[in-house]
Each structure stands twice: as C-alpha cells, then as structure tokens.
Amino acid sequence: KRILPGRLLGQFSVAKQDRNPIGMQVMGDDGVIAGTVKELWIDQAEVVIRYFEIETLSEFGGRRVLLPMNFSKIGKEAIKVKSILGNQFALVPGLKSQDQITLLEEEKIMAYYGGGTLYATPERQEPLI
C-alpha cells in the first residue's frame, strides 16, 4: 500500500511554512463550492500529497471523493479545480475501501478529472479555430 490517507500515517504532517489544505473549501471552474478537504492522501515512497479527500456538500451527494493534487490550485482561502464544474464532483468515481486506493480506482479518478478538461462544458468540446 503505497498511497494511504494521513489518518493511517501518524508520522506525516504539512510543513509549517506551507498552507494546510485540510478544512479548505474546494470549488469547480464555475466558482461553485463543491465541498471541503477532510484528509490528505500521502504517497509514502515519494513523501508527497497525491490526493485531497473531499467531503462533498449534500446537494452533490455528501460523499467522500478524491481530488488529485495535480488538478488542484491552492489559493489563500480555497482550492480551485479548473477541469470540472462544482456540480460534477457528485459523479467522481468512488473507492471500494475508505483506507486504500487501487490502481484501477486511480485510473478512473484521473480519467474523470482529465476528461473534464476537454468535456466539462459544451464550449470545451468545440475546436478553437
């Protein structure tokens, strides 16, 4: 198990000079707040944050979903996600276990956010020229 939630890894913490994203709101590209960061998922081999675990708002299912770090931009007060809209967090693929992620689950999650980069809105689907 290479990538695990911080709750299982007591020896890891966010560096004091960095902003701790736990508790920050997460918003989609449309500015709609989708939920709040509840946990960090750590890659133990490389000692980096790979995912934010988000608790979505009740109108978006009230589920816990993962947001890949590389699809996130951490601001002063919120985390912005350019690839999908706020309401699209409701359909992020889930995990079978709350304490581990499989390679297939990683692929599905990355594909969901990556696909949103091209298909989240009708405007993104058309050619630029």
PLM features: what roles do these ranges have?
Residues 1-129:
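Peripheral interaction segments used for macromolecular assembly
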